[in-house]
Amino acid sequence: MTLYNEKMIPILDDLENPEIELAGGSTVGMLLSVTNSLIKYICNKTLGKKKYENVQEEVLKIKEEANNLKKYALSIIDEDRVVLDEILKTYRLKKEEPKLYEEACKNGVDFCLEVTKKAVCTLKLVDRLEKVGNR
């Protein structure tokens, strides 16, 4: 039987490996996807329970939103690498092509802002679920 900690070791090794340039947003994507999975777990523990039948509709909405946020979070794990690569590539050319570098940096900031907004959405789901979810 494989334990979960054994499954995590390769991921953590990649994060520590200087040969693999994972950007910080990749880690944020991992954490957001785990957080949204935990939200879905609590929803699943709440749904179908007689004690919580008056909040089933709200819990279903929360679960659906958490699922969408989880999908987004998984996508940013790799997308963050693409954004960082573009910044690094244009950084080397910033004297010859300053506009390209500026655009890459702007895209990086826009990406970070979008990720931050999704993280806030996740926090809001936690707040909503805390009020109605399984205790």
Where are these regions (language model features)?
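A structural-propensity feature for long, helix-poor, extended segments
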Residues: 51-87
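Amphipathic alpha-helical interface segments
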Residues: 80-135
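Amphipathic, well-ordered alpha-helical segments in soluble domains
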Residues: 7, 11, 34-41, 76-79, ...
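Residue-level recognition of alpha-helical structural elements
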Residues: 23, 27, 55, 62, ...
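Phosphate-handling active-site elements
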Residues: 38-57
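Short, hydrophobic/aliphatic alpha-helical segments
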Residues: 3-20, 134
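Conserved phosphate/anionic-ligand binding catalytic regions in large, soluble enzymes, centered on
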Residues: 17-40, 135
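Amphipathic alpha-helix face/heptad-repeat signature
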Residues: 27-34, 62, 69-76, 108-122
